Amino acid sequence: LGLSSGRVAFDDLRFGQQLGMETIEVVDGYDPMMYARCVKTDVEIELLKRATTVNEDAICRSINAWSRGMMWQDFNHEYHKSVIELGGFVRDPGAMVWGNPCGGDPAVTLHSRLDDFVMEPGMNILFDCHGTLDLYCWDGGKTWVVDGEATGDAKQYANATAAAATAVMEAMRPGTRISELQRVGRAVYRTSGVTGADDVLIFFHGLGLSHMELEQFCVDGVPNHDWQLEANMVVPLHILYPGDEHHRIWIEEVVRVTP
């Protein structure tokens, strides 16, 4: 292969340097690797569909396992158990990403793995679950109102979030940039009469063998912050309307980009 001399790129730069090969010039190959992986083949699309189905089924099983007085950590265990029964895999320390602060706290936090609380009826639980099936990742979930449904202001926030997600997904076409999609989502909140449109988190990433699948830097060295969609990318859309445990609303949809 001619890899014993010349300029050789490694997606793990540290590994390349540890080889200590004096006859090669070690360069960073992470971005070229991500460039190749960002657009999915038909086979990869099917693998990602299967992984997504495992996540959806595991979420439904977990919800069905809930009972009054159940603790958050026990609920997490039900999700992990369901994933294994369905043939999937969850990395330690767990699949759930978002924290669910209680006591009226509107903070946006990640699950610390030490959080624990009684999952009371009427609480909004944010499902953002990570795992793999046949090495391909799943990512996604929505808001579950424990033993009920959204009411009052929370229902308005939920409806606005659903409408924003629908509008953004419709706009997720080849050539569209992330900043354009964020503007589409915020515009829906403003026209729906919901306050705090600028506080809503709207973000995206690639999905495949990892939860990145994107170049961090373009070929000219410019950070790839406002990246452009391409056909057959698989891109999760995330929208989080912040609030306390009765008002925060979350939706994540995994989207295949098509013309």
Predicted ranges, named:
Residues 1-259:
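Active-site neighborhoods and metal-handling regions in enzymes and metal-associated proteins
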